[in-house]
From Swiss-Prot:
A motif (EXKPK motif) lies at residues 136-140. This is Inositol-pentakisphosphate 2-kinase. One of its GO terms (molecular function) is molecular adaptor activity. In brain, it is expressed throughout the hippocampus (CA1, CA2, CA3 and dentate gyrus), inner layers of the cerebral cortex, and Purkinje cells of the cerebellum. In heart, it is expressed in cardiomyocytes but not in interstitial cells, blood vessels, or valves. Also expressed in testis. Disruption phenotype: Death during ermbryogenesis before 8.5 dpc, suggesting that InsP6 is required for yolk sac function and development. The EXKPK motif is conserved in inositol-pentakisphosphate 2-kinases of both family 1 and 2. It is an enzyme of class 2 (transferase). It catalyses: 1D-myo-inositol 1,3,4,5,6-pentakisphosphate + ATP = 1D-myo-inositol hexakisphosphate + ADP + H(+). It comes from Mus musculus. Belongs to the IPK1 type 2 family. InterPro entries: Ins_P5_2-kin (IPR009286), IP5_2-K_N_lobe (IPR043001).
Length: 489
């Protein structure tokens, strides 16, 4: 960043989460990411600098090795003029969602992270004139717990995402339950993946967003009907997939365009990057490969068809690598929580050891190497407990990451430069795949995760599963009074 040339009018609001806010540059393919804090919990400039540097180091030394360097963009910490930051904050305030304004942008330290704009293709530093489409997917956890420490039998049958949906709707977080199940997307089976992606398009919640030329055009809003939204989305997407304009408008056009989008995303998700590293983890999928709550699986089950269709993911693709990192959670939160308590007890006795244990960093090669110890035999030591706690934090990070797929039509008669290309029915699309939201989950969040897990499972068991049992019981009772009488002929 060139300090003397910072103009807030060249930057626009891009989005925000619980802990940070992002602005994008109008011409250059870069974004600035600022930390956010509650008004009464300000941090010093030194603490903010260390926090941001830890994020960069974790991406560079841990996630790049696990996921592959082509997929992970670490960025760098930059120091900005305070006047620029304050003016920028004033400029974007009116664009922020009201629900996010409980925290303030850090305008005191001047530190931020400079990252590539992942809604653009990642082989260009400046915005291209050709149209660029970007699909952001938050796939969530792609496996069912296989740990023997799990006490709720339901957790061995239904995935966390599907169970959590019911609690979120009950508490008003979402209006309706999504048909999306992460296990369908991670199955590698194209039919299941297509169903999962269509389900995300019908009920995006905060798991899918679509950008066109860096501007959000779909997702993160439930005020309008999905049908109206999909019709408008198809209008935006038509030039990407049917450039000759051979399709008329109407419901058939909408279906054709959405079908093409789903097929292209599936192909991209199953593609491998030749330059990406193979990945250091070799964890086999041990739990069930089908979630009993998935509408796709239920439909097949009701038709008497095999529900265990699981083609498997290609080992070089990003979904496979993400799933491998997620499976560092070998013990589930139920098995992990007692180990967390062991570490906590040790820190109460020896608080000065917190730095030695690398709980707050540094996230270096030493930290990374300890994550590769996949032993599950507890020897009763703090070292074993700490390794499992750190693996759990990394796994939770992978369970909450986002995948960004950028697509752009290949111009006729031109080479694809360095970019891989995916064919669609009527066009060829250059693409890049990236992953973001890779901040290491905080050590302090483990007790919250333990309580939330219990809350999710208990609610699902008492309401949804109990209702299913009642329905099955009623069906049985309808027939139990029937008597077959045989008469001699």
């Amino acid at each position: 960043m060139e300090e003397g040339k910072m103009d807030e009018n060249e930057w626009s609001y891009h989005g925000e989460g619980n802990k940070s806010l992002v602005v994008a540059h109008a011409q250059r393919c870069v974004v600035l990411r600022f930390l956010k804090f509650p008004p009464n919990k300000k941090k010093t400039s030194e603490e903010i600098l260390q926090h941001l540097q830890n994020i960069v180091d974790f991406g560079k030394n841990v996630m790049k090795d696990f996921l592959g360097e082509n997929y992970v963009h670490c960025g760098e910490v930059v120091q900005l003029p305070l006047e620029f930051v304050k003016q920028l904050c004033l400029k974007i305030q009116c664009e922020r969602p009201e629900s996010r304004c409980d925290k303030d942008l850090d305008t005191f330290s001047g530190y931020a992270m400079c990252l590539p704009n992942l809604t653009r293709l990642q082989t260009f530093h400046f915005a291209e004139h050709r149209p660029i489409l970007c699909v952001e997917i938050k796939p969530k956890c792609g496996f069912i717990p296989f740990s023997n420490d799990v006490t709720h039998e339901m957790k061995h049958k239904v995935c966390r995402y599907c169970m959590h949906q019911h609690l979120k709707v009950a508490t008003g977080k979402w209006k309706k339950i999504s048909k999306y199940c992460p296990l369908d997307l991670y199955s590698g089976n194209k039919q299941r993946m297509h169903f999962a992606l269509r389900s995300l398009l019908q009920e995006t919640q905060n798991n899918l967003r679509i950008f066109k030329n860096g501007e959000l055009i779909y997702g993160c809003g439930d005020a309008r009907s999905p049908v109206a939204d999909l019709k408008e989305l198809a209008h935006h997407l038509k030039p990407f997939f049917f450039p000759s304009n051979g399709l008329a408008s109407g419901p058939h056009c909408t279906k054709a365009v959405i079908r093409e989008l789903v097929h292209v995303i599936t192909r991209v998700l199953l593609s491998s990057s030749e330059k990406a590293r193979a990945g250091a983890l070799r964890l086999g999928l041990q739990g069930p490969r089908v979630c009993e709550a998935s509408p796709f699986s239920r439909s097949l089950h009701n038709q008497g068809k095999n529900t265990s269709e699981h083609s498997g993911l290609p080992k070089g693709c990003l979904l496979y690598k993400t799933l491998q990192v997620q499976m560092l959670d070998q013990l589930d939160i139920e098995g992990l929580y007692p180990l967390y308590k062991r570490v906590e007890q040790y820190l109460e006795e020896f608080p000065e050891e917190r730095k030695t244990l690398q709980i707050d960093g540094p996230y270096d090669e030493v930290f990374y190497q300890k994550l590769l110890d996949l032993s599950t035999e507890d020897d009763g030591t703090v070292a074993f407990a700490l390794t499992k706690v750190q693996q759990y934090r990394v796994a939770m990070t992978a369970k909450d990451c986002s995948i960004m797929i950028a697509l752009s039509p290949c111009l006729q008669g031109t080479s694809s430069d360095q970019r891989p290309v995916i064919p669609s029915s009527r066009s060829r699309l250059a693409f890049s795949v990236s992953v973001l939201d890779l901040d290491l989950k905080p050590y302090e969040s483990i007790p919250h995760q333990y309580k939330l897990d219990s809350k999710i499972v208990n609610y699902y068991s008492k309401t949804v599963h109990a209702k299913d049992d009642t329905v099955r019981s009623t069906r049985f009772k309808e027939h139990e009074d029937c008597t077959l009488v045989l008469h001699k002929v």
